[in-house]
């Protein structure tokens, strides 16, 4: 269940079902039941108007009640907005089916763990690490192909562990399923022409680049970063001011976009 929460409010304030709530990026939610404040707290159940992961939000993310309620601030915060998954894209599904067709389970080979992990909703990539926690142990690192945040939710990690465990040898007693650590990469760019549209296009290209090249034990090469920027629609020329050196990604990491500074 998802909620919007207010704290430090008067008791007896009521938000009715069907009220519209909006996030800063214009994603909308609707209250699914009536709720009344008590003990200075108002917590109302909500559902996102759009299907998939777009409705997920970190606890504390600002939300706005579109229709004001007398005595209640319009601004509240997200509370437990997790667990939304995008419908698997056709090409991703096709690739997974083909992979399963060509890769017959072999009783716990490295590729088996990857195939099993991808059978869990929200997981499109996985890596197997033998002897991760000692001789005989198997580590499985899981991730999605989300361009903004490929690190799965804790609930997805739990689901993967529960799914793989019975399939793995010895009922998965030596199995460790875990999520990657985000390796945040910041950029400093001078671009010509410099418009909001071109900045957005460059941002999109960099996200796609990090998904392709920012895999565990990979290396982000400065030349390929520049190549990605040059592929942005409308970009004529640019200067990559940072990073200036290639960036190595550790075996337990995935590269994710940090801050882009524009000059």
From Swiss-Prot:
Coiled coil stretches, renumbered: none
Top-level taxon of origin: Bacteria
What Pfam families does UniProt report for this protein, alphabetically? Answer: Baseplate_J
Something else the entry says is:
Encoded by the e14 prophage.
Q: Which family does it belong to?
A: Belongs to the Mu gp47/PBSX XkdT family.
**The protein's name in its UniProt record:** Putative protein JayE
> Native species of this protein?
Escherichia coli (strain K12)
The gene name on file is jayE
């Amino acid at each position: 269940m998802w909620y919007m929460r207010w704290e430090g409010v008067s008791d007896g304030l009521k938000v009715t079902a069907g009220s519209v709530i909006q996030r800063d990026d214009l994603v909308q939610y609707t209250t699914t039941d009536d709720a009344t404040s008590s003990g200075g707290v108002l917590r109302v159940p909500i559902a996102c108007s759009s299907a998939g992961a777009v409705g997920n939000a970190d606890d504390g993310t600002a939300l706005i009640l579109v229709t004001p309620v007398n005595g209640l601030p319009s601004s509240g915060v997200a509370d437990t907005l997790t667990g939304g998954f995008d419908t698997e894209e056709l090409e991703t599904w096709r690739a997974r089916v083909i992979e399963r067709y060509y890769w017959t389970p072999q009783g716990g080979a490295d590729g088996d763990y990857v195939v099993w992990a991808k059978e869990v909703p929200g997981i499109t990539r996985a890596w197997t690490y033998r002897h991760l926690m000692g001789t005989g142990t198997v580590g499985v690192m899981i991730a999605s192909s989300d361009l903004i945040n490929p690190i799965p939710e804790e609930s997805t990690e739990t689901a993967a562990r529960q799914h793989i465990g019975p399939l793995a040898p010895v009922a998965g007693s030596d199995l460790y399923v875990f999520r990657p650590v985000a390796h945040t990469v910041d950029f400093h760019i001078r671009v010509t022409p410099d418009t909001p549209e071109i900045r957005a296009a460059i941002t999109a290209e960099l996200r796609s680049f990090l998904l392709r090249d920012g895999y565990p034990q990979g290396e982000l090469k400065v030349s390929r970063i520049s190549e990605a920027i040059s592929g942005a629609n409308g970009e004529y020329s640019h200067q990559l001011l940072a990073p200036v050196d290639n960036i190595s990604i550790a075996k337990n990491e995935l590269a994710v976009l940090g801050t882009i500074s524009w000059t």
